[in-house]
């Protein structure tokens, strides 16, 4: 896997829209994956023998314009979710700095552990709304996919989900790479 042509952060500013605007969603079965209410990590694990999280980078950064409701820095974590050594999903998480000290979460010590397992195993993280976006073939994420030897021939689709913890809100974006879409839609 070669991701040296780009560097952290890989994400980009994009227009997200409410998932209930079904006229803009891709056809099934990818649509069902985008709108799945539970843990994407858990769903992905049912499709492989070996599940792995590859951390691309993490650190304190300013979010992209219109990416996060509050101004100022957040903790950004970008990973690839790989199934049987094939990257299926690019994930970008925005964590408010106030949550970094949350003892039960240990966001800074996650390493290669899946964030989804943490979020869906604790009652104090409440899943919120899902938004959906598409990324064209010239996007940074399409270039990332190409550097992973995955040709992007049409739009990449992704979702972002809000998680609430008290007064704090974190955002998890998950973009399906071409290998995932091929496997899901075959």
From Swiss-Prot:
InterPro entries named among the record's database cross-references: Chorismate--pyruvate_lyase, Chorismate_lyase_/UTRA_dom_sf
Pfam families, alphabetized: Chor_lyase
Keyword Nucleus: no
Single GO BP term: pyruvate biosynthetic process
The protein's annotated pathway: Cofactor biosynthesis; ubiquinone biosynthesis
Similarity field: Belongs to the UbiC family.
Binding-site positions, substrate: 77, 115, 174
Enzyme class: lyase
Source superkingdom: Bacteria
Name under which the protein is recorded: Probable chorismate pyruvate-lyase
Provenance organism: Shewanella sp. (strain W3-18-1)
Cellular localisation: Cytoplasm
GO molecular function (one): chorismate lyase activity
Chain's role: Removes the pyruvyl group from chorismate, with concomitant aromatization of the ring, to provide 4-hydroxybenzoate (4HB) for the ubiquinone pathway.
Main location: cytoplasm
Catalyzed chemical reaction(s): chorismate = 4-hydroxybenzoate + pyruvate
HAMAP family: UbiC (MF_01632)
Gene this chain is encoded by: ubiC
EC number: 4.1.3.40
Keywords, ordered alphabetically: Cytoplasm, Lyase, Pyruvate, Ubiquinone biosynthesis
Gene Ontology cellular component list: cytosol
């Amino acid at each position: 896997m070669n991701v040296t042509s780009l560097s952290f952060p890989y994400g980009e500013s994009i227009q997200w829209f409410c998932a209930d605007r079904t006229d803009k969603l891709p056809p099934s079965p990818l649509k069902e994956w985008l709108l799945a209410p539970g843990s994407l990590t858990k769903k992905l694990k049912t499709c492989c023998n070996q599940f792995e999280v590859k951390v691309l980078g993490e650190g304190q950064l300013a979010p992209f314009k219109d990416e996060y409701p509050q101004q100022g820095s957040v903790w950004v974590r970008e990973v690839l979710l790989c199934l049987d050594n094939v990257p299926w999903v690019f994930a970008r998480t925005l964590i408010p700095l106030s949550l970094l000290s949350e003892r039960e979460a240990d966001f800074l010590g996650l390493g290669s552990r899946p964030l989804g397992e943490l979020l869906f195993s604790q009652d104090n993280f409440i899943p919120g709304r899902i938004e959906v976006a598409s990324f064209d073939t010239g996007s940074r994420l399409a270039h990332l996919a190409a550097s992973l030897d995955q040709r992007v021939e049409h739009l990449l689709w992704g979702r972002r989900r809000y998680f609430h913890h008290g007064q704090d809100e974190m955002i998890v974006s998950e973009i399906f790479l071409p290998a995932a879409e091929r496997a899901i839609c075959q």
